[in-house]
Amino acid sequence: MPEDAAQPTGRRHEKYDRLITAAQRMPAIGMAVAHPCDTVSLESAVEAAKMGFVKPILVGPAARVRAVAKEAGLDIAGFELVSSEHSHDSAAKAVALVKAGKAEALMKGSLHTDELMAAVVARETGIRTARRISHCFIMDVPGHADALIITDAAVNIAPTLEEKVDILQNAIDLARALGAPEVRVAILSAMETVNPKVPSTVEAAALCKMADRGQITGALIDGPLALDNAISPDAAAIKHIVSPVAGRANVLLVPDLEAGNMLAKSLSFLAGADAAGIVLGARVPIVLTSRADSRSEEHT
């Protein structure tokens, strides 16, 4: 992520390409793909392997997986295939591979998200940690110089203040792992002033103070901020907001899942943004795919 978010760029996919290049410098990791029984998920795993990101371990009913590969013209001969009985079994076996240290990442195939996450958070057999599990979108928005991390738009529906602490720390850790020289977090609301009648503004103020006290680390944090004065220097100047984050945020913490999901999908479908999604807070990163995802979005 470049230092100055204020300078626009006209080059399409620039941030996406940088992310791909950075990932290709690292060794491929083993990734358990749970129930890749449709073309989209299986093709995404194959493409990610071709690009040198992962070594897929396919977990699903063997006959179905091979049939999908044959129909789609995909060569999976070099991949390990762990047979399962059904989607629930696929999720359990994929998580078991991670728990046993045989896979360093997990990917959702053609099963419901709830099925996979139930296996992830299972008390005895799952891979949860003390950290709250949350989702981040990394968005490459045309015309915006910085990649934007948006959280949480997929897992936590109406997070509490306590849960937002973990959600925020997960996003900060991700931004730093992606090489951001400075992580600048905007805690979003509909306004930039604290209003006791608007809970998200009160929580934003509390999160900022928690950061001041070292309860959240690794980033500059400001909020509440409305979306415009979080990412537009001009909008921040008009409102006379002076902070190292206003107009330059590269991480956006949304009030709830509905706001985050609409923001991320608006950027994708109206602004043509590329999106890479990841679930954090478990022992390994988890890729959740959507039926509306493009192939490039899935293997990012």
Regions found by a protein language model. Give the residues of each.
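Anion-binding alpha/beta catalytic cores of soluble intermediary-metabolism enzymes, centered on
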Residues: 1-57, 61-299
